[in-house]
From Swiss-Prot:
Organism: Salmonella paratyphi A (strain AKU_12601)
Catalytic activity: L-threonylcarbamoyladenylate + adenosine(37) in tRNA = N(6)-L-threonylcarbamoyladenosine(37) in tRNA + AMP + H(+)
Family note: Belongs to the KAE1 / TsaD family.
EC number, UniProt record: 2.3.1.234
Protein name, entry field: tRNA N6-adenosine threonylcarbamoyltransferase
Positions that bind Fe cation: H111, H115, D300
Manner of cofactor binding, per the entry note: Binds 1 Fe(2+) ion per subunit.
Main function: Required for the formation of a threonylcarbamoyl group on adenosine at position 37 (t(6)A37) in tRNAs that read codons beginning with adenine. Is involved in the transfer of the threonylcarbamoyl moiety of threonylcarbamoyl-AMP (TC-AMP) to the N6 group of A37, together with TsaE and TsaB. TsaD likely plays a direct catalytic role in this reaction.
GO CC term (a single one): cytoplasm
Amino acid sequence: MRVLGIETSCDETGIAIYDDKKGLLANQLYSQVKLHADYGGVVPELASRDHVRKTVPLIQAALKEAGLTASDIDAVAYTAGPGLVGALLVGATVGRSLAFAWNVPAIPVHHMEGHLLAPMLEDNPPDFPFVALLVSGGHTQLISVTGIGQYELLGESIDDAAGEAFDKTAKLLGLDYPGGPMLSKMASQGTAGRFVFPRPMTDRPGLDFSFSGLKTFAANTIRSNGDDEQTRADIARAFEDAVVDTLMIKCKRALESTGFKRLVMAGGVSANRTLRAKLAEMMQKRRGEVFYARPEFCTDNGAMIAYAGMVRFKAGVTADLGVTVRPRWPLAELPAA
């Protein structure tokens, strides 16, 4: 069985084909980073228009890569939310239209479930149950996962997501969009301990996060110190260490409260090398395991949507003829599979 996956929730157009026996057959991705760089962030209207231009050509490229034709596709999965409404509508409209034309089921997929299941694409996928850290530009959540669709929200950011804080702080440091990866690169040249940033909300019980204050602390530190390259690198290092430590402390609490031995890390920020190293070290000390997708599957991509679509299709999930998207869509609302 083969599922075509379409991802257009923000500023990446991702198309992939997943086979339940052979695995990933094709993976095509187009990033709009250069398009939005001059604006310092994603412009929703520009994102939607670029998805219109790229989605169908990428589908054609994916079919060619896999050596397949439309008649070989058994279902079409598309991201139905959460995300930018215009961008979502492009993928949903194309996906629903192709499914109708090809006479196959259409499968609406939750974007964050796609991220959560992305590590399942690897050779050593995690078994249930596990704690999932979903950490990206739009979300920072800790979730108890006991099965497909069996998700319990343990904690989340009450303001900025971790990835958003990375990007905003990078902008304060004069780095171009997207700033998160560039800040991490700068931090690798920084001196540990020169600046010490707070670890927000770790001095009290609970599993919620808050990163807006950390961003403000960074802004004040930048204003109060020199603008030389080493100082900026030291500030970047202090900021990254604070975010990583905060995430690690909360993950440890979540594992302690659930009693689980497995931690899954997903979303764009999960590609951060410092975060991966710290969580791997923590899980080794706890005699547990940490799982994450390869870097190209941490950011938005069609492969995770094709895989999640396969899982949901086997559970009987399909869409009607209408095109419906949900820019806001709590993960806990998904049914168990």
